[in-house]
Amino acid sequence: MTPTDPKRLDAQLRRLQLPYIQRHYQALATKAAEQQRSHLDYLEQLVEGEATMRENRSIERRIRNARFPVLKSLDDFQWSWPKKINRPQIQNLFRLAFIATQTNVVLIGNVGLGKTHLSIALGHAACLNGHSVLFTTAVDIINTLAAAQSAGRLKREFQRYLKPAVLIIDELGYLPIDKHGADLLFQIISQRYERAPMVITTNRVYKHWSQIFNNDSTLTSAILDRVLHHADTVIIEGKSFRMKDEIEE
């Protein structure tokens, strides 16, 4: 049998895009021989290493593409601070069943109660479990789409918000939205309706959403209809965690 040429094998592995196997096959072959492991065991170790590397890279890519401002986890959440929070409800959301059922998640509460933290943690968990995610704010969506419309590329820009398995819309209601902005946001909500879920954080209870959308009751009703038809609403009550030190003094 002609001896294997490592250079030729390395080139073939590069062409097949198998970096883990290329880097480790010689060392693992030596180790397998020393341990008298079978060829199948050796091959399984190589393939398992390649698969693990690819999965880790996929996770890193999904997290990078999600554009989280920071990374948060459920373990970091301060459960003791909010005056009212349904912990079992939130923990159940992290089973991620809402993605398969296209159920929206709406986190309602005043500023500084951890709504953004929970939305990021939920998105991060989705990334770890193989789902694409995009984190953005309501104002950023409107500004991006308005600029795209002026540049004649609105249809293409819509895909940024329609493609992810989970779209996180942070800070809905913190700033007023004019008629044009509300129409653009409605198109995103409408096109994701019963196709892919959204995670929305807001400081406004539903009965005050018309104040967000320039007191347009018709548009507000249409938005609420699509958001709430399949939705899990999380109510958080209390004082801002960012004011914790001042409050406790």
Task: Label the model's feature ranges.
Residues 53, 58-92, 100:
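Clamp-loader machinery-focused feature within the broader ASCE/P-loop NTPase space
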Residues 10, 18-70:
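Interdomain "pre-motor" coupling segment immediately N-terminal to P-loop NTPase/helicase cores
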Residues 15-19, 28-31, 49, 53, ...:
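Conserved, well-folded catalytic cores of nucleic-acid-processing
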Residues 85-163, 212:
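Conserved P-loop
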Residues 1-11, 153, 246-249:
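Intrinsically disordered, low-complexity and often Lys/Arg-enriched segments
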Residues 7, 11-14, 23-26, 41-45, ...:
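Solvent-exposed alpha-helical segments within well-ordered globular domains of core cellular machineries
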